[in-house]
Amino acid sequence: GTTAMLRKHHIPYAVAFAQVKPGAAKLWPWNPWERPSWSGASHVFHQTEESLALWTRAGYRNGFLAGDGRFDQVGQRPAPEGLEVFTDHRPVLVVGSSWQKEEALLLPLLMRFPELKVILAPHDVSRVDSLDSQLPVPRVRWSKFESYTSESQAEARVLLVDSLGDLPALYACGHLALVGGAFGPGLHNILEPLVHGLPVVCGPKVQGHWEASDSEAPVTILPMDATPETLATWIKKRLENPPLRFKEAEQAKIFIAKHRGASQRVWEVLSL
């Protein structure tokens, strides 16, 4: 492998942003395939203290705590222009990278919360036509947004996102976020809504996303058997309690700011 070649030619190498789980093969003391590669690194920078502790306990002496470089990559992109007519100073729920389970939780609630505007961005944009046919409320499509009259934009309850790459900026229009994937293959990016101060709700499959379980992050993890009523309770609590929403927005921004700087820490150590 690559690290074997690097060791053979005496080329130093380091590993950034490792996150080790209990029981991982690289921690086994009798693993002659992986341990030489990892112990041969000059530095192995870990995302969390828990990961570093497991590393050190396994006998490695090259571990360092750096933090998570994803926090440095997530940017606070400005909201797209022209959405003010649609949002209309109303609370906005952004449903990001949704799969069918998240949509099944949401769709029955659209009539129940008439004051709520929804930006709905499915993970698979080819499903937009199918989703469109299921919506019981007026909607507009993002790709054609400028072609709608201002009346249609204002009347729409749902903005269907049928393009790729715009979701990070659309989070800037929101107040709450339902992030998809965690009832199925695994959680999608929750740092994008958090950087804009949105409290997040998601499913339970959050392995590999330590930030979803961090007590300092305003993230609510729903059980696998969640129903529309479960989601309704979460939404209602925040719509009826703006101070809670503001508190969670501040919490999210503090959480992001606290964990920035990992890339700089790696660079500073390697520059010594």
Each model region followed by its residue ranges:
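Nucleotide-activated sugar donor-binding and catalytic core shared by glycosyltransferases
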Residues: 1-272
